[in-house]
């Protein structure tokens, strides 16, 4: 009965705690009369890895820093405690993982799904395994495990710019010898490694001010390291992703692409994103891809939220951007284990994306809204009197419709008002409307269940209509 997982109920002292025993149905059980109270000599307790913090926390003042490091009454420099981030990779059929700033863990598939990951130091033949790292990643063509921001051999002190790697095909051997390929290198540009992304026959490592390209070159050096560029980085350890044979990444105030060199991505929503951005929770930013629709997406916290509540998406084929609100904390694209993108919400649920047209069985507000447009740089009023819609409906169980809304204002800082709306169905050829303003925008929207539609190139009958 006791061979289950338990949460600690009470702390007795520094060396003791209690749990509430339960049966396989979850009901509380008590000891029988013959129980001696010590559990016997064969009881083994295995502890889960500390889940860590779910927020970035910073502070200063009394109690921060070391005793005696400053004068009485003097302030101390700030301290920070980072939220828990994981890097996970495949090593053949096995899985390796690393909590940022923690140890290295290995899960062996042959031991079965019910077994736990174990520390690398417990592997057979383990030698000089890193005790701390900020990320681990496998070099795909040669099967070395790289530990970024690891401790140096013989110490427990983390070196935030040190890259260490194990012997080829040997996750346990980290001692460099003339007879193996284990080794290390310290990067020079920057003060810490932010993260890394694997791409075509190389690994791109981001420090806080630079990008490095790491390539397998074989003995005696094993890896060659080239500085790609300085003055750019990525905003968080998971803010870069490999998609369409390129790496797309978000920095503190812009978006970039790496294709052998680094270029900025022209972004029409840049001010919208970075003018309302919670930099105190910047490490929660992560990048995701949706290969089916040629998209990369960054999820981030707006300035008024400590949890992810927004996203910005770039379509790398059409070279267009769109924005929205959504709380997701992790994302997995279509692969061998799923036929739809799978994402995690802040409510501890996993969601299938791109499946159906409803939001978990309820109606979903789906819309496409343009930016403002004008005629003659806003010197002329516009008059619109006709819409020729281009909407494809499919898979709907009823007579589906969408609503076209024309929003207007006469001055850039004026209030947007909805001037006219038009309901459009599958048989609508043309819709007559009336709206006049210097600036307009168009919103196409549906709010009912089972309404799956796709927007094409809508045409509008617009003419200039004077200056006042």
Task: Specify the residue positions occupied by each region the protein language model found.
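Short, ordered beta-strand-loop transition motifs
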Residues: 9-15, 90-91, 111, 289-293
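Short beta-strand segments and strand-loop junctions that repeat across beta-rich extracellular domains
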Residues: 58, 104-108, 151-177, 311-317, ...
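Beta-propeller and closely related beta-pinwheel folds
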Residues: 68-81, 113-285
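Hydrophobic or amphipathic alpha-helical targeting/insertion segments
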Residues: 93-107, 112-116
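Small/polar beta-strand repeat architecture
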Residues: 2-84, 112-116, 124-127
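Hydrophobic beta-strand segments that make up the repeating blades of beta-propeller
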Residues: 96-97, 203, 247, 341
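Beta-sheet repeat architectures centered on beta-propellers
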Residues: 51, 55-62, 66-67, 77-80, ...
């Amino acid at each position: 009965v006791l061979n289950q997982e338990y949460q600690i109920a009470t702390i007795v002292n520094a060396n003791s705690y209690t749990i509430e025993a339960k049966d396989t149905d979850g009901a509380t059980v008590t000891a029988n009369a013959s129980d001696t109270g010590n559990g016997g000599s064969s009881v083994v307790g295995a502890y889960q890895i500390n889940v860590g913090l779910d927020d970035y926390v910073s502070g200063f003042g009394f109690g921060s820093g070391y005793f005696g490091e400053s004068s009485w009454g003097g302030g101390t420099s700030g301290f920070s405690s980072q939220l828990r981030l994981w890097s996970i990779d495949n090593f053949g059929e096995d899985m390796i993982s690393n909590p940022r700033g923690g140890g290295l863990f290995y899960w062996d598939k042959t031991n079965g799904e019910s077994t736990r990951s174990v520390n690398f130091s417990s592997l057979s033949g383990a030698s000089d395994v890193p005790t701390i790292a900020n990320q681990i990643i496998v070099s795909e063509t040669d099967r070395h495990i790289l530990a970024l921001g690891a401790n140096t051999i013989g110490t427990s002190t983390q070196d935030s710019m040190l890259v260490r790697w194990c012997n080829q095909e040997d996750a346990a051997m980290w001692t460099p010898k003339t007879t193996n390929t284990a080794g290390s290198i310290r990067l020079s540009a920057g003060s810490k490694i932010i993260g890394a992304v694997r791409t075509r026959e190389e690994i791109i490592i981001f420090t806080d001010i630079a990008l490095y390209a790491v390539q397998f070159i074989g003995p005696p050096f094993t890896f060659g390291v080239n500085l790609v560029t300085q003055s750019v980085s990525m905003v968080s350890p998971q803010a870069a992703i490999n998609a369409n044979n390129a790496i797309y990444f978000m920095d503190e105030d812009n978006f970039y692409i790496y294709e052998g060199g680094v270029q900025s991505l022209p972004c029409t929503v840049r001010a919208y994103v970075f003018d309302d951005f919670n930099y105190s929770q910047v490490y929660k930013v992560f990048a995701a891809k949706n290969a089916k629709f040629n998209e990369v997406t960054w999820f981030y916290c707006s300035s008024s939220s400590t949890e992810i509540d927004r996203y910005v998406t770039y379509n790398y084929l059409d070279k267009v951007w769109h924005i929205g609100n959504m709380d997701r904390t992790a994302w997995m694209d279509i692969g061998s284990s799923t036929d739809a993108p799978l994402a995690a919400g802040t409510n501890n649920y996993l969601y299938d994306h791109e499946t159906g047209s409803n939001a978990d069985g309820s109606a979903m507000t789906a819309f496409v809204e343009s930016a403002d447009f004008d005629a003659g740089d806003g010197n002329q009023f516009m008059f619109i009197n006709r819409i020729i819609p281009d909407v494809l409906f499919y898979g709907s169980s009823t007579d589906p419709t969408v609503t076209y809304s024309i929003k207007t204002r006469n001055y850039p800082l004026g209030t947007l008002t909805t001037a006219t709306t038009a309901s459009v169905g599958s048989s609508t050829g043309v819709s007559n409307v009336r709206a006049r303003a210097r600036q307009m925008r168009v919103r196409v929207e549906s709010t009912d269940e089972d309404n799956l539609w796709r927007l094409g190139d809508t045409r509008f009958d617009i003419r200039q209509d004077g200056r006042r």
